Curated annotation (Swiss-Prot):
Classification via InterPro entries: Kinase-like_dom_sf, Prot_kinase_dom, Protein_kinase_ATP_BS, Ser/Thr_kinase_AS
Protein kinase domain mapped to chain residues: 4-260
SUPFAM superfamilies associated with the record: Protein kinase-like (PK-like)
Record comment regarding domains: The C-terminal region is necessary for the kinase activation in response to hyperosmotic stress.
Designated name of the protein: Serine/threonine-protein kinase SAPK2
Family statement: Belongs to the protein kinase superfamily. Ser/Thr protein kinase family.
C-terminal, as annotated region: 253-339
Top-level EC class as recorded in UniProt: transferase
Pfam families assigned to the protein according to its UniProt record, in alphabetical order: Pkinase
Gene: SAPK2
Modification(s) after translation: Phosphorylated.
GO biological process: abscisic acid-activated signaling pathway; seed germination
Lineage: Eukaryota, Viridiplantae, Streptophyta, Embryophyta, Tracheophyta
Gene3D superfamilies for the chain: Phosphorylase Kinase, domain 1 (3.30.200.20), Transferase(Phosphotransferase) domain 1 (1.10.510.10)
Length: 339
């Protein structure tokens, strides 16, 4: 890690700590996720790294490399200077329909690419969508800790994600299509951008997860009267929020929906993105064997010492599991901020 100097902390979670760093040589800024060596370097971490490494798209945070310190495994990635989309909504209250569409188009573009690479995200939410620092912000999907590759793994069965965003079939705890479940989560994200609240939470009891789950299973939601939403947008939401995953709208169908196509920037078209990916294909990345060797070494506990004053020994922060009795749901983020 001598190559990077730490600028500041930029986040923490059940994974550990994230820091903003600068490449000493190029002066380029990166975000680094530090995960304590030893037991925390599990299959989820390995899957996150391997899946993230394979993705190269303008709407996905770019993976750079993994580095080993005496105490931590460091995942170096593109820095999104605009922060979380979640924070932007908290500040704005809610978005206009045009602004919501602008971000939704980018979200669907990134998710569509993930699915084309046979990777479903399984934890799509506002906190996992970052923005770059440009005036017309580019959305960047991040955090592939729950992602599943249908090339490397069987169909998902586990109930993971954040309760407000989870699809009914995931809660049923049967085998499900992760791509179709991602569509539901995209719908929740769109709704929150438009309304400034979660579609399936009781406003009087937002922390009552059991009630939220009941509402999800019965697809009980409404767009409040005070929010002006076009009929085309309402139609799209009604096609996303369908309990039967086989009848739910697919990503390709969303990309052909009239509401989605309105004001679609040229860089969001499939033709344009294909040309970008072809140009990007020769960009060198850290080798697979090197990454696997680093992950394997990181499974051994660290030496417990501080690292050269630059990267201090870092603690980690565990989030409480949600108590939903017989339903196992993981809480991986904040829920609501006075929406």
């Amino acid at each position: 890690m001598e190559r990077y100097e730490v600028i500041k902390d930029i986040g923490s979670g059940n994974f550990g700590v994230a820091k903003l760093v600068r490449d000493v040589r190029t002066k380029e800024l990166f975000a680094v996720k530090f995960i304590e060596r030893g037991q925390k370097i599990d299959e989820n971490v390995q899957r996150e790294i391997m899946n993230h490494r394979s993705l190269r798209h303008p709407n996905i945070v770019r993976f750079k490399e993994v580095v080993l310190t005496p105490t931590h495994l460091a995942i170096v990635m593109e820095y999104a200077a605009g922060g979380e989309l979640f924070e932007r909504i908290c500040s704005a209250g809610r978005f206009s329909e045009d602004e919501a569409r602008f971000f939704f188009q980018q979200l669907i573009s990134g998710v569509s690419y993930c699915h084309s690479m046979q990777i479903c995200h399984r934890d799509l939410k506002l906190e996992n969508t970052l923005l770059d620092g440009s005036i017309a912000p580019r959305l960047k999907i991040c955090d592939f800790g729950y992602s599943k590759s249908s090339v490397l793994h069987s169909q998902p069965k586990s109930t993971v994600g954040t309760p407000a965003y989870i699809a009914p079939e995931v809660l049923a705890r049967k085998e499900y299509d992760g791509k179709v479940a991602d569509v539901w989560s995209c719908g929740v994200t769109l709704y929150v951008m438009l309304v400034g609240a979660y579609p399936f939470e009781d406003p009087d009891e937002p922390r009552n997860f059991r009630k939220t789950i009941t509402r999800i299973l019965s697809v009980q939601y409404m767009v409040p009267d005070y929010v002006r939403v076009s009929m085309e947008c309402r139609h799209l939401l009604s096609r996303i929020f369908v309990a039967n995953p086989e009848q739910r709208i697919t990503i390709p169908e969303i990309k052909n929906h009239p509401w989605f196509l309105k004001n679609l920037p040229i860089e969001m078209t499939d033709e344009y993105q294909m040309s970008v990916q072809m140009n990007d294909i020769n960009t060198p990345s850290q080798g697979l064997e090197e990454i696997m060797a680093i992950i394997q070494e990181a499974r051994k506990p660290g030496d417990g010492s501080k690292f050269s004053g630059q990267i201090p020994g870092l603690g980690s922060m565990e989030l409480d599991d949600i108590d939903t009795d017989d339903i196992d749901v993981e809480d991986s983020g904040d829920f609501v901020c006075a929406l």
